[in-house]
Design a protein with these regions (language model features):
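Short, surface-exposed ligand-recognition loops at beta-strand->loop->(often short) alpha-helix junctions
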Residues: 9-18
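An amphipathic, aromatic/His-enriched active-site/gating alpha helix that lines ligand/cofactor pockets
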Residues: 20, 24-36, 55-81
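Short, well-ordered beta-strand segments in beta-rich or mixed alpha/beta enzyme
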Residues: 2-9, 39-66
Length: 81
């Protein structure tokens, strides 16, 4: 299994649209054939601190995720947030 932990500090003024876009990406990611798990976690101390826990069958499946339309749309949407 190949696991990625992505730590993000979202800008407070964009938090809700950031979470919406991130949850949409996660919902699509779990349908990928190589995906094992995709969790969107928020800090209880600071809700703008977000951790993405992504588990894939292998490194190739993780790399394939970064080429999907939903991932590319997410990256473009949240780039400045």
């Amino acid at each position: 299994m190949y696991v990625s932990l992505v730590s993000i500090h979202a800008k407070a003024e964009f938090l809700e649209p950031f979470l919406e876009a991130t949850r949409a990406n996660a919902a699509a990611a779990v349908k990928e054939p190589g995906n094992v798990r995709f969790d969107v976690l928020r800090s209880v101390e600071d809700p703008t601190r977000i951790l993405l826990y992504e588990a894939y069958r292998d490194a190739a499946a993780s790399a394939a995720h970064k080429e999907t339309a939903h991932y590319l749309r997410w990256r473009e949407t949240v780039a400045d947030w």
